[in-house]
């Protein structure tokens, strides 16, 4: 993303490195950016809820995603279906409007960037995608969830 900004690309994509997101969706993301009213496009695992379950999203993550996205929508008066996706495409011109010095370069980067987009009235579109989950044994989801809820009120 920062390489795209530095080199004045038109569009950039961000894909989490956890092998959950297939690159086959990237052309659809970029195609959606052709509509100039959108500054970013995300792949939503929850737009068609069964897609998340077909991709073997653990039930606790499924329920957690619904709850945390509900809270986000409540606070910011938005109607997203998946605030925790790891698949984004951006219009680089709009990324240049963001002060990245105020955004944490960790697990909460995506949600802080989403909040920045909303606060700047930049439009985000969601397209439905499927993902694939592998067996995982991480306790970070609890810490992430707590930090996410804190951010809703900190960056509002």
Features from the language model and the residues they span:
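Acceptor/aglycone-binding surface of glycosyltransferases and processive sugar-polymer synthases
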Residues: 1-6, 11, 23-103, 134-142, ...
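Acidic metal-phosphate-binding loop of nucleotide-sugar-dependent transferases
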Residues: 19-20
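Catalytic donor-sugar/metal-binding loop of nucleotide-sugar-dependent glycosyltransferases
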Residues: 78-79, 101-105, 114-130
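DNA-recognition element of transcription regulators
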Residues: 111
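C-terminal, non-catalytic tails of nucleotide-sugar-dependent glycosyltransferases
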Residues: 151-156
């Amino acid at each position: 993303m920062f390489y795209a900004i530095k080199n004045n690309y038109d569009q950039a994509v961000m894909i989490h490195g956890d092998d959950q997101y297939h690159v086959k969706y990237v052309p659809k993301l970029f195609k959606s950016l052709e509509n100039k009213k959108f500054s970013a496009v995300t792949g939503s695992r929850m737009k068609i809820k069964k897609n998340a379950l077909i991709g073997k999203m653990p039930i606790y993550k499924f329920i957690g995603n619904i709850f945390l996205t509900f809270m986000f929508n409540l606070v910011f008066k938005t109607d997203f279906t998946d605030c925790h996706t790891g698949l984004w495409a951006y219009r680089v011109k709009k990324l240049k409007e963001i002060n990245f010095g105020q955004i944490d370069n960790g697990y909460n980067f995506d949600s802080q960037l989403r909040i920045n987009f909303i606060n700047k009235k930049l439009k985000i579109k969601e397209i439905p995608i499927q993902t694939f989950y592998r067996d995982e044994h991480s306790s970070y989801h609890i810490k992430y969830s707590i930090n996410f809820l804190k951010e809703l009120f900190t960056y509002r």
